[in-house]
Amino acid sequence: MNDYYKNKYRIESNRLKDWNYADFGCYYITLVTHGRINYFGKIGNDKMIYNDIGNIVNEEIIKSFDIRKELRLKEYVIMPNHIHFLIILRKDKVIVYDKNNVPVLFRKPKSISTFVSSFKSSVINKVDDWIDEANIDIPKFDRKNPLWQRNYYDHIVRDDK
C-alpha cells in the first residue's frame, strides 16, 4: 500500500469489513446533521416537534420508501439533529404489492449507501427549494455549508433481539 500524504487525508471506513451492503438484510442506520445542529425541530413535552425542515425530511422519508420497492422501512425516528432508520433490503425476486394490492416488479436491491446518498441529496434539494419559495434569508446548503455529516452510522441487525 502506498503512503500517499502519509495517510494524513485518509478516512477510515466504519463499515463492517467483508460485508456486502447490497446484500439483503435488516440495517439500523443513523444520519446526523453537520455539527449536530438542530435543523429538524425540537423536543417539547417529550415529543418531537418538527419545524419546516423537519417536515421536509419526514415527507422525503415517506417518498423515498414509496419509490424504492427494494427497500422496506420498518421504523424511523426523526430527532432534532439526527434520524434513525430500521431498513430491510429485500431479497431479489420478492413479490411486492402496490397500494391496490397488485403485484409489481422491483429492481434488484442497490446498496444501503446508494439509498443514503440519494436521500441526503433529495432532502437538500427540497430544503433549498423551500428556502427559495419562502424567500427566507438563510444560506442554502452546499459543501461550505453542509446539512449532513459525512457518511452514516450503521448496524447490521442479525436477529430479532
Predicted regions and their residues:
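Short catalytic/metal-binding and nucleic-acid-binding patches
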Residues: 1-161
